[in-house]
């Protein structure tokens, strides 16, 4: 029987991955992490199909433990990935288990290729960024690009509902507030700052207009190469509550001015505040991907793909690609080998099929 180990399987994202994988009774699913009690609690919730194991991602015997458990696929959900090294991925290669993570940290995802030779040597796939970015975002661009002879710009983003994400996710996305980041603009790299350059983006109902600002994601580095000769790649994100977005923007200026070193140490307090305000906010989230360029007759063309999520189902979306890829690996349906960012491994339909039953809808418009 094939076996999937979900590292961090009792966290916000990990639990969702476990729940989805455990629905297939033909494979073993192991909830893993440092806290065995929490792992057992999640495994017990599954009603029998999941097991629990104590695993420390920093342990020197991690590879041996994965081998002992019989892992075929490891899904690493224990973020934040900003500042992490590849110790888990290396252990998976040594244990001869495929590796999938939900990282959206730019340096982490873009650097995963350093493990390519080792992964190929052991006939494995090591895929980083099986999340909203770059897995879903690149799948959308791949789907839309068939209408274009040339893509000149890619502008995409995400706006979340009032339900706050987990602590690790907040630490990751607020860690670069006010910090410089490189953005591809008009065929040259320019410096912008995290959570600044606020833009008002109008989304279809039920979302409406939202403020979004600069975020540092792998797409900013990967897309200029993958979709060359694209001249501009921009990614922005935001939250539903205007006061929260403007507060983040204001705090980013304190970091940029050197009055604060980072917002990371303030995240617990910020999250507690967000939890108190949650009931006053929207339950709707959205993602958009806008391509502009030329069609086959060299005429200007623009297309926008929208993903609209209601009833607090938006936080499920970052897990969909990892679940889809893990399921395909467990079924032996993925031929790709090597270490790479998660692009070109899944289609939009394959990713969204995992979200069947959620309050999600998509549409494409010509702007």
Briefly describe each language-model feature range.
Residues 28, 38-111:
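NAD(P)H-binding glycine-rich loop region in Rossmannoid oxidoreductase-like domains
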Residues 2, 27, 152:
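Nucleotide donor/acceptor-binding cores
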Residues 257-367:
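C-terminal active-site/capping subdomain that shapes the small-molecule cofactor and substrate pocket
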Residues 4-22:
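N-terminal Rossmann NAD(P)H-binding glycine-rich loop of SDR-like oxidoreductase domains
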Residues 24-29, 33:
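A generic structural motif
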């Amino acid at each position: 029987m094939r076996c999937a180990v979900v590292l961090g399987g009792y966290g916000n994202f990990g639990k969702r991955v476990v729940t989805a994988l455990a629905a297939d009774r033909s494979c073993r699913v192991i909830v893993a992490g440092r806290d065995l009690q929490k792992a057992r609690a999640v495994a017990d919730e599954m009603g029998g199909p999941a097991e629990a194991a104590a695993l420390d991602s920093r342990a020197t015997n991690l590879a041996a433990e994965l081998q002992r458990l019989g892992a075929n696929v490891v899904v690493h959900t224990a973020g934040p990935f900003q500042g992490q090294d590849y110790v888990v991925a290396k252990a998976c290669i040594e244990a001869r288990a495929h590796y999938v993570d939900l990282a959206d940290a730019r340096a982490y995802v873009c650097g995963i290729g350093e493990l390519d030779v080792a992964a190929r040597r052991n006939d494995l796939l090591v895929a980083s960024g099986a999340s909203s970015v770059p897995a879903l975002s690149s799948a959308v661009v791949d789907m839309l690009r068939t209408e274009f002879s040339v893509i000149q710009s890619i502008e995409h983003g995400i706006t979340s509902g009032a339900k706050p994400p987990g602590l690790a996710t907040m630490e990751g996305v607020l860690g670069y507030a006010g910090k410089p980041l490189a953005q591809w603009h008009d065929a040259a790299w320019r410096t912008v700052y995290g959570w600044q350059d606020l833009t008002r983006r109008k989304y279809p109902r039920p979302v409406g207009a939202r403020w979004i600002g600069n975020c540092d994601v792998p797409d900013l580095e990967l897309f200029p190469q993958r979709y060359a000769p694209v001249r501009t790649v921009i990614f922005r994100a935001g939250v539903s509550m205007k006061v929260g977005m403007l507060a983040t923007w204001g705090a980013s200026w304190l970091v940029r001015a050197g009055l604060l070193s980072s917002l990371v140490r303030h995240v617990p307090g910020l999250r507690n505040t967000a939890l108190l305000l949650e009931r006053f906010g929207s339950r709707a989230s959205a993602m958009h991907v806008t391509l502009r360029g030329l069609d086959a007759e060299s005429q200007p063309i623009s297309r926008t793909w929208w993903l609209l999520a209601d009833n607090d189902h938006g936080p499920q979306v970052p897990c969909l690609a990892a679940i889809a890829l893990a399921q395909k690996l467990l079924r032996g349906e993925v031929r790709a080998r090597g270490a790479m960012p998660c692009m070109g491994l899944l289609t939009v339909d394959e990713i969204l099929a995992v979200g069947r039953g959620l309050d999600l809808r998509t549409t494409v418009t010509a702007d």
